[in-house]
Amino acid sequence: MKMQSNITKIIIIMSLLIGVGALYVLLSLSTPKKPLAGQFNIYEDKIKIGGPFELIDQNGEIFNSDKLRGHLSLIYFGFTSCPDICPTSLNKITNIVEILHQNKIDIIPVFITVDPKRDTPEVLKEYIKNFHPKFISLTGNEHQIKDVTDKFKVFYARVNSDNDDQNYMIDHSSFTYLIDKNGRYMKHFYLDISAKEIMELFKNE
């Protein structure tokens, strides 16, 4: 009975967090819907999203966002223990990057963890091998992760499981952010976008 009670509590907590997270993301990122192909509003409505950050990469080296300047980048926030949406999104990004590179569009994929406690540089280095070889994976301390997620309007919240300090999940928003060569936010999107649609962004660039 106690175990069933704990499971029920966890389900209720996760449902509440998902609801709050969805509301947060909708309020932070919602913009009028526009047709995708050929009609991107690149700096959509001048929403204040993104900004400079300093984290630690998968090699244990300090990584400053200035290193991305001169390149387009795709930034995704998640965590290595994520069972489904994160690997699905990273595989999608891998496919997009491959196609863009084939079309001579230089773009760097970036994975930023929202679970710095477990996602050390060593853990990230092994995990990111499953995806595009150009991926940069980043972690940091709690303050650094809070800073960069605030700048990108990313929602995330830890959900405890049986009070185990290592056995927990993280509920988080799941958008990919397209950043231009000057480090400016261009667009955010979910899994329903193609490399062709992204290429439409650069027709008049």
Curated annotation (Swiss-Prot):
Pfam families membership: SCO1-SenC
KW Metal-binding (keyword) present: yes
Binding site for Cu cation: 82, 86, 172
InterPro entries: SCO1/SenC (IPR003782), Thioredoxin-like_sf (IPR036249)
Stored CDD domains: SCO
Superkingdom of origin organism: Bacteria
Alphabetical UniProt keywords: Copper, Metal-binding
MF (Gene Ontology): metal ion binding
Keyword Metal-binding (UniProt): yes
Family affiliation: Belongs to the SCO1/2 family.
The protein's name in its UniProt record: SCO2-like protein RP587
